[in-house]
Curated annotation (Swiss-Prot):
The gene is tatB. The keyword Transmembrane helix applies. It is a single-pass membrane protein. GO terms for cellular component: TAT protein transport complex. The keyword Nucleus does not apply. The lineage of its organism: Bacteria, Bacillati, Actinomycetota, Actinomycetes, Mycobacteriales. Signal peptide: none annotated. It comes from Mycobacterium bovis (strain ATCC BAA-935 / AF2122/97). The chain crosses the membrane at residues 2-22. Belongs to the TatB family. Part of the twin-arginine translocation (Tat) system that transports large folded proteins containing a characteristic twin-arginine motif in their signal peptide across membranes. Together with TatC, TatB is part of a receptor directly interacting with Tat signal peptides. TatB may form an oligomeric binding site that transiently accommodates folded Tat precursor proteins before their translocation. It is found in: Cell membrane. This is Sec-independent protein translocase protein TatB.
């Protein structure tokens, strides 16, 4: 929670504490906050070790599943669509349609023209009945 607080922010907090609490009560408040954080950390580590003892090897599996959920939670809608529905092909979103898709061998062989072949140099085919 406090992993990204820098020295500048700490200095601002001390200055605000000095103004609000005064120089007499500030050291006691800092000691109280440090001991409260230490107790909370000890309590949480005790709970973790108790769960590890009670659940056993399933605890690591549970942590793995929670890690996967955390990855999904951090995904943007675009990344989720790309990963799960489009099998990682993000050309729909990036507009990079020029790269050829890998060929899959047909059971009957090559019955028709290859869809990835380039159309000859000439006018672009146009269908007036198409919408």
């Amino acid at each position: 929670m406090f992993a990204n607080i820098g020295w500048g922010e700490m200095l601002v907090l001390v200055m605000v504490g000095l103004v609000v609490l005064g120089p007499e009560r500030l050291p006691g408040a800092i000691r109280w906050a440090a001991s409260a954080l230490r107790q909370a950390r000890d309590y949480l580590s005790g709970v973790t070790s108790q769960l590890r003892e009670d659940i056993g090897p399933e605890f690591d599996d549970l942590r793995g599943h929670l890690g996967e959920l955390q990855k999904l939670r951090g995904m943007t809608p675009r990344a989720a669509l790309t990963k799960h529905l489009l099998d990682g092909d993000d050309s729909l979103f990036t507009g990079d349609f020029d790269r050829p898709t890998p060929k899959k061998p047909d059971a009957a062989g090559s019955a028709g023209p290859d869809a990835t072949e380039q159309i000859g140099a000439g006018p672009i085919p146009f269908d007036s009945d198409a919408t």
